[in-house]
Swiss-Prot record:
Matching PANTHER family: OLIGOPEPTIDE TRANSPORT SYSTEM PERMEASE PROTEIN APPC, PUTRESCINE EXPORT SYSTEM PERMEASE PROTEIN SAPC
Domain of life: Bacteria
Name this protein carries in UniProt: Peptide transport system permease protein SapC
Pfam families found in the cross-reference section: BPD_transp_1, OppC_N
Cellular-component GO terms for this entry: plasma membrane
Job description of the protein: Involved in a peptide intake transport system that plays a role in the resistance to antimicrobial peptides.
Length: 295
């Protein structure tokens, strides 16, 4: 063991090998392609939507979906109480809900990852102090933290994103912090430190590759939470405001039409659930592929 190089304690493999394993999981691969399609939709929503998201068609209010007797193919998912095409609003909503969640997760992954690494390398009293701070945050639900932060700011989508970011960060940092602390307690780390290896070399060669699975799982979890929280904040009027076609805001604006025109509420809800399920299936498949190679 003493003759081993630091890289020999690395448990992860190349990205190409992981991809080959991942491709064998048909369902996970399909979910990956669908997620890419959703991201593509978010980027080019204004070109893909049949109509402008706030265009009102007079006399076409509460038109049911096209597969219902009264429905029209021109309004594939029907219209709302103002005569706006729901399909167009759902497509544009991809930019607001999915796009916002991706921006939040990207920020969490970078900021949370960096702070988690710094916290994980702390020792002694500093490490215990940081641990107690995290324990205090972990006693509160993420959505509750986001709601409290949002109430201190003016209701808007950007403020909802900021509140969601601040709410997720402590949990993300704590997970990375614990993963690194656990890795530092392993025998190979103690041995490498006795040989005089620097923390930077130790992180790069072994610790960070060995917590890749945990990192991916937390990023996927953060994405799911971001989608839910941004939609929830808009639903309770703390996020996106009218007439922004954010999915949570669409549900709020049409909630009173649930029995009269259920498609105006159910379709945005299905969009949220569909996005979350795709993310979970993809992350589980990727995690499984990494674990298979580590074995």
């Amino acid at each position: 063991m003493q003759n081993k190089e630091p890289d020999e304690f690395r448990e992860s493999t190349s990205i190409f090998q992981i991809w080959l394993r991942f491709r064998q999981n048909t369902i996970a691969l399909f979910s990956f392609y669908l997620l890419i399609a959703l991201i593509f939709t978010a980027l080019f929503a204004s070109y893909l939507a049949p109509y402008a998201d706030n265009r009102q068609f007079i006399g076409q209010e509460l038109m049911p979906p096209s597969w219902v007797d009264r429905g029209k193919i021109a309004f594939f998912f029907g219209t709302d109480d103002l005569g706006r095409d729901i399909l167009s609003r759902l497509i544009m909503g991809t930019r607001y809900t999915l796009g916002s969640a991706l921006l939040v997760v990207f920020s969490v992954a970078i900021i949370g990852g960096a702070l988690g690494i710094i916290a994980g390398l702390l020792k002694g009293i500093k490490a215990r102090f940081v641990g107690h701070i995290f324990d205090a945050f972990l006693s509160l639900p993420i959505l509750l933290i986001a709601v409290v932060i949002s109430t201190l700011m003016e209701p808007s989508l950007w403020n909802a994103m900021f509140a969601t970011l601040l709410a997720i960060l402590p949990y993300f940092i704590h997970t990375i912090y614990r993963a690194i602390q656990k890795e530092l307690e392993k025998d190979y780390v103690v041995m490498l430190k006795l040989e005089g290896i620097s923390n930077q070399a130790l992180l790069k060669s072994t610790i960070l590759p060995n917590i890749t699975v945990i990192y991916i799982q937390e990023v996927a979890r953060a994405f799911v939470i971001a989608v839910l929280d941004i939609s929830a904040l808009s639903f309770i009027s703390l996020g996106a405001q009218r007439p922004t076609p954010e999915w949570g805001a669409m549900i709020k604006d049409s909630l009173e039409l649930l029995y009269l025109a259920p498609w105006t509420v159910l379709l945005p809800g299905f969009a949220i659930i569909f996005t979350i399920l795709l993310s979970i299936i993809f992350s589980n498949g990727l995690t499984k592929a990494i674990n298979q190679h580590q074995e």
